[in-house]
Amino acid sequence: MSIFRTIAMFIYLFGYMIVHYGVLRRAERALAAGDMQLVEELVNKHIPHWSRGILKVTGVFLSVEGLENIPKDTACVFVGNHRSYYDIPLLLASLDKPHGILAKEELEKIPLLNRWMKLLGCVFVQRDDLRASVRALNDATAIVESGKSFVIFPEGTRYKGEEGGAGEFKAGAFRIAVKTGAPVVPVAITGARALFENNAVSYTHLTLPT
């Protein structure tokens, strides 16, 4: 990833979380008190704003196709290809509201970010531990059963091959859909890999089912 884009992304990422630390604490207190309406209100306001801000300050222009095809009034399992670290803010900036994500355990160790991710409903997974992976999938299944949509990158890691390709899909995302009966919404992200290779203004595209 270009050094300038990396610096800009991390300055904005942590700068936003520090400036809005009071919002984080308010959301955590609401969660502890069982006020889920307030938690969702704060998360739905700030996480998309944070995601769009990252794209703006790093010179990323996003086009989205197919939002009208997302099933309404039901929890979905969003299944996307994984090309770069930008995939998460790209998705969070595109959907009508943010959703929990099956994320690698390393992200749980990042201060402030881990707390926002927990409020969002993210589930952290140890990819090299089968039992822990099963527990994580069960947790994600419970979230979908509760009526909330969830995002999974079924390759399990970023795909580093040619643009247009994809890694081997793991079965976890589809098991969640089968167990819950939730519709699977495929998401194709193109152009995200290029964000790692230059400092120029870049375009990326996100396609939902047609």
Where are these regions (language model features)?
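Short gly/ser/thr-rich secondary-structure transition/capping motifs
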Residues: 57-65, 133-134, 190-194
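A hydrophobic membrane-anchoring feature enriched in long, contiguous, low-charge segments
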Residues: 3-29
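Glycine-rich helix-loop-beta junction characteristic of Rossmann-like nucleotide cofactor-binding loops
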Residues: 67-70
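Short, solvent-exposed loop/turn segments at secondary-structure boundaries
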Residues: 128, 162-167, 199-200
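Catalytic core of membrane glycerolipid acyltransferases/transacylases, capturing the structured
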Residues: 20-33, 40-44, 56-58, 72-130
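Conserved small/polar residues in nucleotide/adenosyl-binding loops
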Residues: 204-210
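Short glycine-rich, acidic/polar surface loops and turns
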Residues: 140, 173, 192-202
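Conserved Motif II region of HX4D acyltransferases
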Residues: 74-78, 138-185, 206
